[in-house]
């Protein structure tokens, strides 16, 4: 990662009320507690208490577009659907994250690193 710990934004996406979509908020809550303990200047957005659901993504995207220069590293974390053999795996890319593909409505988010936990099968791939 480039920059220092003060320049990192961790964006954890998902709905804490939906089991299959709660990976982001679960990790966000854990990271928030850990980051506040170890380095309060790292920003974590999206927790079980304050989740970032699909309906929030346009607002978050606008925020990131305006304030991208404040962060040298943006990490996005979300649950995702994938092939049967990838369920339970974590996929990490040096690229943007396209959230909402599981509901056939993707929203691309600015990020340097995207982390997706495959939580279920994407039945669209089987067609």
What are these regions (language model features)?
Residues 1-74, 79-126:
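N-terminal catalytic or cofactor-binding beta/alpha core of small enzyme domains
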């Amino acid at each position: 990662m480039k920059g220092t710990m003060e320049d990192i934004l961790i964006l954890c996406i998902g709905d804490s009320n939906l089991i299959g979509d709660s990976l982001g908020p679960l990790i966000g809550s854990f990271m928030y507690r850990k980051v506040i303990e170890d380095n309060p200047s790292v920003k974590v957005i999206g927790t079980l208490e304050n989740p970032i659901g699909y309906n929030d993504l346009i607002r978050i995207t606008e925020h990131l577009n305006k304030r991208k220069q404040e962060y040298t590293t943006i990490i996005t974390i979300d649950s995702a659907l994938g092939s049967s053999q990838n369920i339970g795996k974590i996929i990490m890319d040096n690229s943007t994250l396209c959230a909402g593909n599981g509901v056939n409505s993707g929203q691309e988010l600015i990020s340097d690193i995207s982390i997706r936990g495959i939580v279920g099968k994407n039945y669209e791939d089987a067609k």
